[in-house]
């Protein structure tokens, strides 16, 4: 059925070699991406603020569930600290939704960015990241930024997915390592 398979991760090679399936390691595009041009961030980021990057998801179903949780997180952090700038890494599709909810929450130490080059630079200058489970966790890990992974979905969907998928972790980094390297707050723990 397979003539040849292209591998995203080097560790996959031993599995396909064992099964005598022709393969070539090509790498993961997110892990090899380098910003070609740098943007001056001095107008975007106050010098006296530490950046916490936030990833609420790219799909509206994810964003609508995770955004209120992330806004509550910001409020809790603001009660204890005043030296953080929270930056939402948005898509063009969810940028307005995030901005509208920030206005309703009456928070002023938040920025929303959607430019890919700027997002990469912001992430590399962050002291911490909170992200949804998914490919973005690879990007965060590659940037060597401490993080946690959050994910929450409709209860019935969660039960359905949990019955189909028999893995211990939600984050690809933890799945690869078969242990919790990146802390996960999933479903009921994500509040």
Describe each PLM feature range.
Residues 1-191:
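Nucleotide-activated sugar donor-binding and catalytic core shared by glycosyltransferases
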